[in-house]
Amino acid sequence: MSLLTEVETLTRNGWECKCSDSSDPLIIAASIIGILHLILWIFNRLFFKCIYRRLKYGLKRGPSTEGAPESMREEYRQEQQSAVDVDDVHFVNIELE
């Protein structure tokens, strides 16, 4: 059985598509998967900055500040916030040494 079920033929009225076995479950499943793939790809292209920024930085809490003095913790928070405020278009990663 071939997955290529559509044949275009030239008629007097123009190009027509003659589909055979269009009720085949395999064809229906492949069509649904193809449509879902297209929708997900479009959403990915539209929202990739938001999605990847959220995955990369939103789910991480950053390095542990346990045992560090409160002044260093506050300084780290301010640096993180200023990096986000200054450059909202590009990803910014600040690592303290």
From Swiss-Prot:
The chain crosses the membrane at residues 23-43. Pfam families: Flu_M2. Keywords: Disulfide bond, Host cell membrane, Host membrane, Host-virus interaction, Hydrogen ion transport, Inhibition of host autophagy by virus, Ion channel, Ion transport, Lipoprotein, Membrane, Palmitate, Phosphoprotein, Signal-anchor, Transmembrane, Transmembrane helix, Transport, Viral ion channel, Virion. The modification Phosphoserine is found at S64, S82. Residues 1-22 are virion surface. The record marks H37 as: Essential for channel activity, possibly by being protonated during channel activation, and by forming the channel gate and the selective filter. Residues 60-83 are annotated as: Disordered. The keyword Ion transport applies. GO terms for biological process: protein complex oligomerization; symbiont genome entry into host cell via pore formation in plasma membrane; symbiont-mediated suppression of host autophagy. A lipid is attached at C50 (S-palmitoyl cysteine). It is found in: Virion membrane; Host apical cell membrane. Residues 44-97 are intravirion. The record marks W41 as: Seems to be involved in pH gating. It comes from the Viruses. GO terms for cellular component: host cell plasma membrane; membrane; virion membrane. InterPro entries: Flu_M2. Homotetramer; composed of two disulfide-linked dimers held together by non-covalent interactions. May interact with matrix protein 1. When the channel is activated, one or more imidazole moieties of His-37 probably become bi-protonated. This is Matrix protein 2.
